[in-house]
Structures are given as C-alpha cells and as structure tokens.
UniProtKB/Swiss-Prot annotation:
Its main location: secreted. Residues 1-20 form the signal peptide. It comes from Pongo pygmaeus. Keywords: Antibiotic, Antimicrobial, Defensin, Disulfide bond, Membrane, Secreted, Signal. One of its GO terms (cellular component) is extracellular region. Monomer. Interacts with CCR2 (via extracellular N-terminal region); this interaction may preferentially require specific tyrosine sulfation on CCR2. Disulfide bonds join 26-53, 33-47, 37-54. It is found in: Secreted; Membrane. This is Beta-defensin 106A. The lineage of its organism: Eukaryota, Metazoa, Chordata, Craniata, Vertebrata. Has antibacterial activity. Acts as a ligand for C-C chemokine receptor CCR2.
Length: 65
C-alpha cells in the first residue's frame, strides 16, 4: 500500500515536460510562436493563429548573429 501511495504522489506531482523540438519557429528560426512574450523576450513578428513571434533579448556584451 505504501508503494502505491508513493507512486501516486510522485506521478501526480510530476509536470509534463515541454518539448521545444515541435514548437513553431519564426523570425528566420530565431524566434518562437507564443501567446505572450516573456520578460526577457521581444516581439519581432506575428505568427498564424494570432500568436506572437518572440525572441530572447541578447545582453549588450554578447551580440551573436
């Protein structure tokens, strides 16, 4: 019975992992289509289905392009 309760608690509290491989890419594959952009992201374009194309803001010291 303890094993069942332990397994139930572990499986109940696990969150599903997010797979970045299947996310829709945009902005020459440098952005991701989302409902809302995060704090460290900027809106660079619009995607289909009224989604926003967000790209992570790079710090000034490390500009990679």
């Amino acid at each position: 019975m303890r094993t069942f309760l332990f397994l139930f608690a572990v499986l109940f509290f696990l969150t599903p992992a997010k797979n970045e491989f299947f996310d829709e890419k945009c902005g020459k594959l440098k952005g991701t289509c989302k409902n809302n952009c995060g704090k460290n992201e900027e809106l660079i374009a619009l995607c289909q289905k009224s989604l926003k194309c967000c790209r992570t803001i790079q710090p000034c010291g490390s500009i990679i392009d």
